[in-house]
């Protein structure tokens, strides 16, 4: 349901913006495409009815001077940013029937201070040069859920390349454990006589972190680990 909603919202926002500004193009007049990446429960095929959407917007336009081809042209960068803003507005506007979804965009490069819609070359450079280990963990459960197949293919190639990097196992273990302990300190609601099934020791998030560690540790040698974003099939593969 969520993926159908995302695709429809994207189509509506796209139609609205292209009617005003035209289509984003490069010097050859070609549209380089736009895609929505789903992270977390959405990317991992575990979305519940009460879940929010962890999203990242990427596009294929890398020329900062490229413009749309309509009567009121704007730069491609502005167009894609407005597209993302319009989509978030449509997801989160409250109506008498409620809202579609809460949206979390903090997993994009540089978090809340980063561009709302990121050129895919910038996304790739960030993942190679600046991303923290926890951001690579997040890639384990990331996949394109709507958008241009060309951008989807480029994203998947980047994802696989990052996850298949050979890493220092000792540093990886320290990084993963440090992040897990930070999360536990803030989120674990276990108490005497009560166990937090999600955040408690041995709970759901511990299992997720173990799976993510395993992918980052061994995907360099066992590429079949790159084929899934959900914990069930990753556990079966392991």
Role assignments for model-derived ranges:
Residues 1-238:
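A nucleotide- and high-energy phosphate-metabolite-utilizing enzyme signature
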